[in-house]
């Protein structure tokens, strides 16, 4: 029986991971880290002490915010433990910590734990190369409570397009248009964010040319999709060598390259 710990147990994803874990026969949630009171009554250790969390699990699943994730990674540097990191918008500090931790333990980091999004990302890479002269626009939609924009998944997709086309994303990405801005630049990659209602997540990558266009879409209808993906990723990363992996590695789409 594999023991998993949840870092961020009071959030929407932490709660869903605990619920979904009850459907797995080969794991147990053995510890939950949370600063806020839980709205459910788990049958495991609940703590706000990282040491206690780490001591009572085989791997940690993190869904928090930037500061919480960075605190976890800083602790993990001197207390290696397999980590499944789902927190997005980590910034340069968080990304550097991920790489540093990857030298001491197996870490899987994914801005989206969905199998469908992994396939969307793979198709986006292929389309970006084949349709090199097509304009690319990315649109993401989420619920009104989402705090960061663009979503981590949208940024991953944008990076995929830029890498496939040999572009520097920071130089070609835009996040909105307003006023007399002139014609669209040739290599521009637009990433647009919409917020409203209770939309779990929708991502669209469009390739547009004169006379034709193609759009690749993924819609998540339940957070259980991400929760189940995170649990499976945590089970996978436990058996890997030290390194920084992503969801494509877990699914066998490519080997670890970082």
Curated annotation (Swiss-Prot):
Belongs to the DapB family. Transmembrane segments: none annotated. This is 4-hydroxy-tetrahydrodipicolinate reductase. GO terms for biological process: diaminopimelate biosynthetic process; lysine biosynthetic process via diaminopimelate. It comes from Campylobacter hominis (strain ATCC BAA-381 / DSM 21671 / CCUG 45161 / LMG 19568 / NCTC 13146 / CH001A). The active site is at 142 (proton donor/acceptor), 146 (proton donor). GO terms for molecular function: 4-hydroxy-tetrahydrodipicolinate reductase; NAD binding; NADP binding; oxidoreductase activity, acting on CH or CH2 groups, NAD or NADP as acceptor. Catalyzes the conversion of 4-hydroxy-tetrahydrodipicolinate (HTPA) to tetrahydrodipicolinate. It catalyses: (S)-2,3,4,5-tetrahydrodipicolinate + NAD(+) + H2O = (2S,4S)-4-hydroxy-2,3,4,5-tetrahydrodipicolinate + NADH + H(+); (S)-2,3,4,5-tetrahydrodipicolinate + NADP(+) + H2O = (2S,4S)-4-hydroxy-2,3,4,5-tetrahydrodipicolinate + NADPH + H(+). NAD(+) binds at residues 8-13, 86-88, 110-113. Keywords: Amino-acid biosynthesis, Cytoplasm, Diaminopimelate biosynthesis, Lysine biosynthesis, NAD, NADP, Oxidoreductase. It is found in: Cytoplasm. The lineage of its organism: Bacteria, Pseudomonadati, Campylobacterota, Epsilonproteobacteria, Campylobacterales. One of its GO terms (cellular component) is cytosol. Its main location: cytoplasm. Pathway: Amino-acid biosynthesis; L-lysine biosynthesis via DAP pathway; (S)-tetrahydrodipicolinate from L-aspartate: step 4/4. Its EC number is 1.17.1.8.
